[in-house]
Amino acid sequence: MTVEDGHASVVDAFDRLAGGAPECIWSSPGRVNLIGEHTDYNDGFALPFAIAARAYAAVRRRDDGMLRMASVQLPDNDVTVALDDIAPGTPTGWAAYVAGVVWAAREAGHEVGGMDVLVDGRVPLGSGLSSSHALECAVAAATVHVHGIEAAHDDLARLSLTAENDFVGAPTGMMDQLASLHCTAGHAIFLDNRTLAVEQVPLDVASAGLALMVLDTRVHHDHAEGGYGERR
């Protein structure tokens, strides 16, 4: 699916959910890491690149102080919560990844009001492709855009990291978010986790007669509840 096809699909789904069009749609890709597993929180180096699968977030403001969240992958499982009631533990489940970003933005001092948010996560879940970070980055970008908040890529990454660490409870580093936000077509990024400096690195393996293969091991993992936190 192209990005354009993904946007069109989300527009249709948002219309069915809330009636009318969203104010904005943002998307963010999953990633594969060539070198540097578990180096982000150890001040090491990493070399990730983005993949074609993306997460989408469609947003429209509302004036009643409520956050309504829906997922294309989980129909009839909408979650609505008052902004003032959002805190770690409320809500839980898939909606925590959306509400956590909104909470992180408000905790950072940004004026974020009520919204309808529809997400479409097309990065395979629990497969090591950073599905949650792609979703959080898309929600962060859409949230700041619709509220007129100026935010650089690294600012969005920090909002996503705060949501992941302090709201969802997954003790990750920031490599995945930075990869999702900084990677460009035909490149990996060289990430120095000591300074968070990012350098674009050409990755044209096809010109050398090679191909990168990403294989599904069918081993599910969960940063919040698996062994990741224990290893860290």
Regions found by a protein language model. Give the residues of each.
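A generic structural signal for short coil/turn motifs at secondary-structure boundaries
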Residues: G44, L125-L129, D222-G226
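Short Gly/aromatic-enriched secondary-structure transition segments
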Residues: D43-A50, G229-R232
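ATP-dependent small-molecule kinase catalytic core of the GHMP/sugar-kinase superfamily
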Residues: I149-R232
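Short amphipathic
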Residues: C24-S28, T80, A211-D216
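Short Pro/Gly-enriched beta-strand edge/turn motifs at strand-loop
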Residues: E37-N42, T162
